[in-house]
Amino acid sequence: MKKINFLTLLSALFLFASCDTGNNSIGLSNWSDDGKVYKWHLGTENAVNVAINVDKAMQNRDYTLLRNFLSDTVSITASNGVKYDLESFITRRLEIDSIVDSRNASLKWEFSNIYSVDLDPTRGGEHVSVTYSGEYKDENGKDTWNSINRYYVMDGKVVWWNTFNQDIIDSEN
């Protein structure tokens, strides 16, 4: 009987000891403020939700709501390299909305992937990547593109936002 209890205890210890309960990480990056090399960790759903809320506000052209998800000191870099602060970005978005409306055009996009990764889960801040497909259409035709927005999210707000675009060449057969 003692032998069976000992084997049961030993099996249970082996089972629990063999489970990896550590924080999984992968890859490497020296993209940090201290210059150290870190591994990537999975981010949180909270940071992903910030990106989803930014998208909802942009889709609805609700720039008052958008302010809730961007820090007052946010740095935004468009795909053409132009940099914006919060106020100049919203001013530019209002101009773009006006141009789209005056041309009776449509500007649509939808995301296909959102994920968050973190270099150091013990310090705040997560890198969120959002992949989009977009389309602008007016009386002259349409333009389509793929886009990646990269956000750095801290305390529920985007601190910086970079956009990268790839035009899609539509060919007719």
Give the predicted meaning of each segment.
Residues 54, 65-67, 74, 89-92, ...:
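Hydrophobic pocket/interface hotspot
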Residues 19-64, 68:
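Short, low-complexity N-terminal intrinsically disordered segments enriched in polar/charged residues
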Residues 37, 41, 73-85:
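A short gly/proline-enriched turn/hairpin at secondary-structure junctions
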